[in-house]
């Protein structure tokens, strides 16, 4: 309720100003999630589980992060949260680095994504762990089937199209191949791993990494989602706030009349 009033006020303040159109979409997405009870509850759960850094061996790290619990909470967020809202958080389009940094931090990467060491392992390591995992393996196969370009082509994408690719990508978050944005100046994504130290299996390693980084099907799906995002979020928040705008308008008008 208080939040709705705040949003409505903010809306009044911003209407007609140029900043309204080029605002931070990741902030918009976070606000839309906050306004939805289920999204907000699931997000609070993973934030509480994912604070702090991961430590080796599944012990709680500094700040109490147990990676397996954090990842389970993230999987629940995507499995049970409203996709329009969870996907808006995950795929919000950014122009500046402040927005991109926020997007990179969305899923508490110190616990869910990187570490516990300082140097990322070879990508063959998470790949092999995923292939041995009953949870991860089908999700990775679905990601390959729905997001990888056709063999021998760089940009012929699976026919089911972008929305399915985004859904299965989101399904990888919280597995041993959890991907994230790599920096705050691009939209490149990958699991936390590299291919420098992969010896004679370099090609296999690069092939896995290319599923994520500069994959034209995944990048295209993210861009297509982003071009629809403002209308998606408006639909989500409309039920919450827009009716209040009218009486706030009336109140503002009355207050102005009193002043004049
Ligand atoms: C972007 O990332 C760099 C390197 O990690 C960091 O130094 C910088 O503070 C980040 N920018 C923002 C706006 O957070």
UniProtKB/Swiss-Prot annotation:
Signal peptide limits: 1-23
Propeptide, chain numbering: 238-260
GO MF, one annotated term: coreceptor activity
Keyword Cell membrane set for record: yes
Any one cellular-component term (Gene Ontology): side of membrane
Glycosylation sites: 184
InterPro entries per record: GDNF/GAS1 (IPR016017), GDNF_alpha (IPR037193), GDNF_rcpt (IPR003438)
Annotated tissue distribution: Expressed in many tissues including adrenal medulla, brain neurons, with highest levels in the cerebral cortex and hippocampus. Moderate levels found in the gut circular muscle and myenteric ganglia as well as in other peripheral ganglia, including the sensory dorsal root and trigeminal as well as superior cervical and sympathetic chain ganglia. Isoform a1, isoform a2, isoform b1 and isoform b2 are exclusively found in the thyroid, parthyroid and pituitary glands.
Any Gene Ontology biological process: cell surface receptor protein tyrosine kinase signaling pathway
UniProt keyword list: Cell membrane, Glycoprotein, GPI-anchor, Lipoprotein, Membrane, Receptor, Secreted, Signal
Record lipid sites (GPI-anchor amidated threonine): 237
Family that this chain belongs to: Belongs to the GDNFR family.
Function, as annotated: Receptor for persephin (PSPN), a growth factor that exhibits neurotrophic activity on mesencephalic dopaminergic and motor neurons. Acts by binding to its coreceptor, GFRA4, leading to autophosphorylation and activation of the RET receptor. May be important in C-cell development and, in the postnatal development of the adrenal medulla.
Subunit structure: Interacts with ARTN ligand and RET: forms a 2:2:2 ternary complex composed of ARTN ligand, GFRA3 and RET receptor. Interacts with SORL1.
Annotated protein name in UniProt: GDNF family receptor alpha-4
Protein's organism: Mus musculus
């Amino acid at each position: 309720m208080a939040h709705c009033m705040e949003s409505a006020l903010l809306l009044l303040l911003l209407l007609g100003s140029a900043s309204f159109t080029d605002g931070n979409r990741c902030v918009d997405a976070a606000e839309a999630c906050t306004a939805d009870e289920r999204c907000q509850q699931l997000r609070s759960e993973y934030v509480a589980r994912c604070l702090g850094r991961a430590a080796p061996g599944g012990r709680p790290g500094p700040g109490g992060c147990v990676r397996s619990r954090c990842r389970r909470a993230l999987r629940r967020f995507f499995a049970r949260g409203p996709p329009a809202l969870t996907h808006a958080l995950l795929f919000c389009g950014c122009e500046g680095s402040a927005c991109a940094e926020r997007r990179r931090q969305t899923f508490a990467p110190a616990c869910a994504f990187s570490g516990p060491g300082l140097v990322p392992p070879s990508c063959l390591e998470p790949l092999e762990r995923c292939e041995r995992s009953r949870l991860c393996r089908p999700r990775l196969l679905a990601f390959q089937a729905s997001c990888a370009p056709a063999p021998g082509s760089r940009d012929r994408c699976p026919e089911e199209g972008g929305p399915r690719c985004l859904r299965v990508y989101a399904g990888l978050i919280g597995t041993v191949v959890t991907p994230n944005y790599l920096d705050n100046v691009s939209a490149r994504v990958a699991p936390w791993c590299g291919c420098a130290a992969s010896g004679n299996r370099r090609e296999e390693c690069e092939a896995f990494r290319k599923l994520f980084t500069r994959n034209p099907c995944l990048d295209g799906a993210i861009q297509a989602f982003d071009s629809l995002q403002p209308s998606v979020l408006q639909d989500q928040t409309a039920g919450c706030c827009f009716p209040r705008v009218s009486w706030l308008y009336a109140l503002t008008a009355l207050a102005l009349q009193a002043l004049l």
